[in-house]
Curated annotation (Swiss-Prot):
The keyword Oxidoreductase applies. This is Bifunctional protein FolD. Signal peptide: none annotated. The gene is folD. SUPFAM superfamilies: Aminoacid dehydrogenase-like, N-terminal domain, NAD(P)-binding Rossmann-fold domains. Keywords: Amino-acid biosynthesis, Histidine biosynthesis, Hydrolase, Methionine biosynthesis, Multifunctional enzyme, NADP, One-carbon metabolism, Oxidoreductase, Purine biosynthesis.
């Protein structure tokens, strides 16, 4: 039986440290960090994450402001709105939910978010900082949450074979960069990789971030491995439930350590979002 690596203890530790740091910032400089959330429409997934972010902000003593716009907002009006949010001096970090409605040019709108307030790597400038090892850039929250999980559970990365299944700019590619920073030997693969199960079996640390329910099965893994499951998918076998990219029931008996879905990496992301907003606030007020 594998050790199941839950996300809650990681999130709790991050929040405890962040609460102390925010209290110190308030005392020393009279500044309260603020997260600004930009949302168009009211998709249930966006509202769910927004609720979690607001709750985490409140728990650590951080302000949070929601900037909500109708789904039929036009391009010019939304560009003006995003520019105004970006210019607010009291907003230190910005999260914008995507995808935006099809009538909006999302690529152009992302350029309007100030890079120094881009706490979820939405902008090209933010991504450039991550991929050039610029410490003033913020990686997306999900890959950062993966790294927080590895650190909290004292899982060594240096010299280890790290296989990332998934090549998105949201998780796979930035996660590979974060693992490389800590001297992991990284392989990025995807659903079309030749002999994907064999490549995955060669890993010391296997991270599934491909967005396919239960794709990673027992023949992808071996004894001694650590498996981090980033996926969040509708469970094809249990209507109304969620599952990861890993078939937990068949993989868990084989490997040494594994994260569950839900209650794994996903439960750490809002704490990371708040941490990166605090860091942005520090840099803006240095």
């Amino acid at each position: 039986m594998a050790e199941v690596l839950k996300g809650k203890p990681v999130a709790d530790a991050l929040k405890a440290e962040l609460t102390k740091n925010i209290e110190a910032l308030k005392k020393d400089k009279g500044i309260t960090p603020k997260l600004g959330i930009i949302r168009v429409g009211a998709r249930p997934d966006d509202l769910f994450y927004e609720g979690g972010a607001k709750k985490t902000c409140a728990a650590v003593g951080m302000d949070c402001e929601i900037f909500e716009y109708p789904e039929d907002i036009d391009q010019a009006s939304f560009e003006k709105a995003v520019t105004e949010v970006g210019a607010k001096k009291d907003v230190n970090g910005i999260l914008m939910f995507s995808p935006l409605p099809k009538n909006l040019d999302e690529r152009k709108i992302r350029t309007l978010i100030p890079v120094e307030k881009d706490v979820d790597c939405l902008t090209t400038g933010g991504a450039a900082k991550v991929f050039t090892d610029d410490a003033t850039g913020f990686p997306p929250c999900t890959p950062t949450a993966c790294m927080e999980m590895l650190h909290f559970y004292d899982i060594p990365i240096k010299g280890k074979k790290c296989v990332v299944v998934g090549r998105s700019l949201v998780v796979g590619k930035p996660l590979a960069m974060l693992l490389l920073r800590e001297h992991g030997t990284v392989t990025i693969c995807h659903s079309r990789t030749e002999n994907l199960p064999g490549v995955c079996q060669d890993a010391d640390i296997l991270i599934a971030a491909v967005g396919r329910a239960k794709m990673v099965k027992a023949d992808f893994v071996k004894k001694g491995q650590i498996v981090i499951d980033v996926g969040i998918n509708a469970d094809p076998d249990r209507p109304g439930k969620y599952c990861g990219d890993v078939d937990f029931e068949t993989v868990e008996p084989v490997v040494t350590k594994i994260t569950p879905v839900p209650a794994g990496v996903g439960s750490v992301t809002t704490s990371v979002l708040c941490k990166q907003t605090f860091m942005a606030c520090q840099m803006q007020n240095a």
